Amino acid sequence: MKFHSAADFVADGLRRLSVFFSPAWWRAFQPARTRISTRERLRLVIGALIGIFLTGLLCHLIGGDDLKRLPWLVAPLGASAVLVFALPASPMAQPWAVVGGNTLSALVGIVGVHGVYLLGAPELAAALAVATAIALMLTLRCLHPPGGATALMMVLGEIRDPSFALCPVLLNCILLVLA
């Protein structure tokens, strides 16, 4: 196409780009509407609320003075709660996946922290920890997406103590599954 002026060139470009600004184009990115009833939505939300609250409360009571130096909830537990309460039939929300995936990933992340010092590159250690956690979760059939976040959290938080994988990670997971 030949343009007679810069204005023609700009006008043609804007005309071609207008398709990206049309409401129909943006609607294509929206997820399909869910058919979850209001009652079911409330059950999911209240389940997650009670699950996280009880997990935090029981960990705080069980941990006692140790919790002055440790958190009693780990952040990836929020994502685990979404799976457990919103997708309870999912293989990734089953007890073995939640408990095994997060705990295994915590241990892998702790090893990854030591790798930071060997490799001298925290980015590489973080990437290796997440990739290794995924590989091991697949091998042990306990794939749980928040486990990747758990491994990453350990490396980024420079958590070196293996007991952190037991308390709070393992304890959090067991209590959430029981909630």
Per-segment meaning from a language model:
Residues M1-V113, Y117-A129, R160-L166, L170:
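Alpha-helical transmembrane segments and their membrane-interface boundaries
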Residues A151-S163:
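Interfacial segments of multi-pass membrane proteins
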Residues A129-A133, H144, L175:
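Membrane-embedded alpha-helical core segments of multi-pass
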Residues P88-A97, L136-G147:
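Membrane-helix interface "capping/anchor" motifs
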Residues C167-A179:
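Alpha-helical membrane-embedded segments
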